[in-house]
Amino acid sequence: MKRPLAEHESRFGNGFFIIGMNQSEKDFRNKYFAVFLATAAIAAVTVLRLKDRLDPSMRGQAVLSVLFIFQVFTIILLSVALCRNLKRNFYSFGNIMVIGAILFETVLTLFLLSYFLSCIGNPADLGVRVIFDRMIAFPRQFSQYAVVFLGLLCLLVSVSNLSLIRHEGFRLKNLNGVILSLLYIGGTLLLYAAFDLLYKKVIVPNGYAGNTWAEGIYLSVTLFLLLFLCYYECVAIGTGILGWAAARKKPAYDKDYIIILGCLISKEGGLLPLLKGRVNRAIRYAWDQEIATGKKLIYIPSGGQGHGEIMSEGAAMEFYLLTHGAEQDEVIAEKESANTWENMVFSKKIVDREKPGAKVAFATTNFHVLRSGILARKAGLNAEGIASRTKWYFWPNGFVREFFGIMAMNMKAHIRVGLILLLCSVAAGVIFAVSG
């Protein structure tokens, strides 16, 4: 019954790039960003001073040492920021970006360390220009490493799609994994082929080979596209890591309300396995909380009436709850929402009306917890997710859909990152041309 992502779901920012952050969150982001910029400035000044004062045989070693220390500091800074932000706002696209950045920086640091060790006894390979060339070549190497790992995951997801089709029937939405695999692997191979074709068919035949400015422009274009590819690869891995952690996170037993997110019901108004799993998980959590603390909670089954459904999903879940031990005063159904965003917004209105400032949980399927948590936070609900399980062949396809949704919700962040990467790529091209 769910409509495509509502415009409300795409007009917000995220984590470190969030629109409408409160002042403490802005101060938190700005403080770490300021420390990072100060460290980068110190590293840059140090490199420039060493370049002028050391003899040529020592410059490369000094520059590489400064870069290595800077990378280690950056990883530590990002890790501290991630740990603090997970406590403040677990469900955040900013956390996904930081996880991806830590991954990229860690691989780059290992790359620099490996390069340094390989040059021991041969200082000639540690020239400043050689180090620069190695650095700008790293994004392609990183992407090649990532495409092996992600390509294998794409293959496994595609296999799960085949099993999903065998059990659930052929539908386009059951091919999310196959579509993502074709887009990623096919797009990456085409990108590499385009780079080689551009150089062989444009740069060389027109006499631009050896022209430092022409090759600098070529470098800027290829480096930007490779960095943007690396960004999406890191975000994909970061989404997987945070999504896995979100599904395994166990909220404290102190909740006043639990929102149950609706999905498709049967033609007769019964709960299909996916939705039944969500409701049963909410019931189990309520029982566990009452046993552990003696505190009862209120169920908010949330979902409107979709096309072809004889009743709202909220009403169907309400009936199921009442016939499985819940009392009438323990259920407040929300029957108007048409997507996850509205689930959270309309349910928040109920919570604010009944008990402002209440502690809230939400129950949904494991692959859906992360995006639901992001939307809950943006709706003003400081809610924690509780995951129900689903069949092994259903989870990968559902998570791919969630990944597409999370990416679509954060277009402004992608644009900002793209602009930063573009500036870095242009700067690298200019440095290459000037120093050539």
Tell what function each PLM region has.
Residues 44-57, 240-241, 246-398:
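A structural signal for short, hydrophobic/glycine-enriched beta-strand patches
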